[in-house]
């Protein structure tokens, strides 16, 4: 993201290291990005004139995801075979395969772009990569951040039924037929609760080694203080997919007598009917609590903290509090009630 410089001439209306949001000044999403050579300029005159000013480049945010999940794959199979005589065999099979997964994404996110609390000497809060306009390290005062307890629970049930018959109708003629029916359904439910805070400051290095960033707040221990986390928004999503298939195949072989021009005639027919339906989630709001609260004022089961994140690496925070995704999923309607949202979650269309 582009920022104006820390000192020297600044575009009108800007303060040191202010982020440039105006897309009339720069175009996001280009394949080459913006030039990163030292002294590169942007034209801040959005009219016919030219007003070139130097700029800096930096990331606007950092995040860490501490993810865990449990997956199950239940399955069952039944096969029955019946041969009433030497010339016919009937086989029935029923098969079930399931998939169940519950995922908890413990997300820590912090902005690193705020320009309003840089102190009397903003230039002292950053360092650049030599010969570039890329910010390598910086200290940002009062950065907004949030943690989010994201829970996704999803499952698939698939049932297959098949009936097969084989007949030796004569010495020359054999026939085989197969009928199979399949039905599958996939359901997914997502619910998340966010908490927010504004700490005193963050000190960061966008590449502390091997392309991995490093950051610490003025007091990382505050991340474990539930009273310092304000309750944020509730997010919900839901989806369903259904599929079915009906397949009939018939195969036959007829052997001609010796001396015939042809030895064998093989023939077959197949009918396949498949269907699929995708149900979109209905648009759902992302409300705040009707009355502001901190995480400390929420039900005890909602609090969760991790430990030794990233194998205890000392260049990033090692633990933080977050809404417990497992508890939120298990008490989804209770959580929805706190946010004045209807029970059952969003509908699917």
Model-predicted regions and their roles:
Residues 1-117, 122-130, 154-164:
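Transmembrane beta-barrel wall of Gram-negative outer-membrane proteins
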Residues 4, 8-59, 122-143, 204-233, ...:
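Flexible glycine-rich, low-complexity coil/linker segments exposed to the extracellular/periplasmic environment
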Residues 4-25, 175-176, 180-197:
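Amphipathic, soluble alpha/beta structural segments
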Residues 14-15, 107-111, 191-196, 281-288:
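Short secondary-structure boundary/capping segments
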Residues 59-105, 140-192, 224-283, 311-349:
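Outer-membrane beta-barrel transmembrane strands
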Residues 113-116, 198-201, 210-211, 288:
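Short, intrinsically disordered/low-complexity patches at protein termini
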Residues 192, 202-205:
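Outer-membrane beta-barrel domain signature, especially the mid-to-C-terminal portions
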